[in-house]
């Protein structure tokens, strides 16, 4: 038999260890030919444990200034069609909405939840997302703070948890130790284009397995910034424009000098 349980919003905020234990036992009839009424028996109690995780995002510029008002959405596919819906939490963070409540499954399918919102960095530049599962996510900046340009490409996050090989032999209470959830690892694949230079990098995020947390800093750099799409043409146009402006300035000086001599 399979037993399914859905975590509520409060449970989703309690990430990492000790996890959430569910105790279950089956009731059965002692008479296989009976319709279920009368004497019954029970299987021994069985305990299972599950874990959720959180992502701590810090939005800054390259001078460590915390940026308020950056907007993000989270997706489970690279085409950015399957949004991971979130709603506001009590502590100014965001809680993942289970797709089961909108006719989907996990992070796929279903309709937009009535409480879903876009994530926005607070006055401290922070965004906290609770209730994440392991897997690959795409974090898309939809709007940058005033004076900055948003990241053109989503940040690809990969949350990986290492569990004991004997997870089916779970002992009640072991979720609070490293016997079950042994390690949490998260990587971020980031694409950058800044001052004419394109860069792709894979970053190992700082994690806390006990808290089930991963820490990501998203930086908006101060300076000239060109989009990756069509960047060569844009760079050529800007260079040519600079040359034309410089030429006009030199021509203007020469014209002025000629008039003065006359």
Show where each model-derived region lies.
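Solvent-exposed loop/turn and edge beta-strand elements of beta-rich ligand-binding domains
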Residues: 1-262
